[in-house]
Amino acid sequence: MLTRKQHELLLFIHERLKETGIPPSFDEMKEALDLASKSGIHRLITALEERGFIRRLPNRARALEVLRLPDSIAPGLSPQKKFAPSVIEGSLGKVASVQPVRPAPAPQNSEAPATVSVPVMGRIAAGVPISAIQNQTHMLSLPPEMIGAGEHYALEVKGDSMIDAGIFDGDTVIIKRGDTANPGEIVVALVDEEEATLKRFRREGASIALEAANPAYETRIFGPDRVHVQGKLVGLIRRY
C-alpha cells in the first residue's frame, strides 16, 4: 500500500509526463506536494522505486519513468496539495476534501430537530501511526449541540493506544478541524506529511510530544516541523 504522499507524487509525475514528456524537477515536485525540503521528495521517489512503480534512468538528469499505477487510481486523477482528514480505509481513488458542515433542514411540519451532517473520513490510528489516505466513506448525522460551530469530520478509531482516555478500538471520534492545539488536548496529528495518528498533544521544550493513553506505548518526540495538527477531539460515539 502506498502512502498518501507517495500516491500524490506518483500521479504528479505521471500527469507531467503525459502533458510534456519531461519529468518534473525536484523543486516542482516539492512545491506540488507542499513539502518543506527536497529530502522528502528523495525519500518518496526511493519508496516508489523500491515498490516497482517508477524507475530512475541512468546517466540522464531528471529521468524518471512510471512503470505502473495502482489499480484503484481513477484515470485522469490529479494530486491535491493540501491535507484533509487523515484516514486509512476505503477506496484509494479520488481524494475527497472535507467540506464545512451545515445543519440539515428539518422537514416541514415536523418537530424533529435539525441535524448536522459530518463526513466520516475512514479510520485513524490510535496506536502506531499508519498511512494517511483521504477518502470520505459516508455521512454521520449528529445533533448540532454535540459539536458547536466550526468545520468537523469523524474518524473511526483503530488501535488501543488511547484506552486510558476512554477511546477504544471501533469508537468514532468527532474532530474539529484546526491546526493548533493546547497542551493536553487530544489531536489528529500528521507526522512527516505521511502518517496520521490520534494522540495527546504535549510540548517538550522546542519539540512536540505525541503521548499515548496506554502505558504499553511510548511517548514519541518530534521536531516542530515534523508534526502538523489536523484537528482536535470534541466528541465520541460508541456503538454497543
Curated annotation (Swiss-Prot):
Stated family: Belongs to the peptidase S24 family.
Pfam family, one: LexA_DNA_bind
Regulation: May be constitutively autocleaved; RecA is constitutively activated in this strain, leading to continuous transcription of recA.
Residue numbers annotated as active site: S161 (for autocatalytic cleavage activity), K199 (for autocatalytic cleavage activity)
Reactions the enzyme catalyzes: Hydrolysis of Ala-|-Gly bond in repressor LexA
Enzyme Commission designation: 3.4.21.88
NCBIfam families xrefs: lexA
Entry GO MF terms: DNA binding; serine-type endopeptidase activity
Classification via HAMAP family: LexA
Protein name: LexA repressor
Binding partners and assembly: Homodimer.
DNA-binding region in chain numbering: 26-46
Function description: Represses a number of genes involved in the response to DNA damage (SOS response), including recA and lexA. In the presence of single-stranded DNA, RecA interacts with LexA causing an autocatalytic cleavage which disrupts the DNA-binding part of LexA, leading to derepression of the SOS regulon and eventually DNA repair.
Site (Cleavage): A126, G127
Domain of life: Bacteria
Group of enzyme by EC: hydrolase
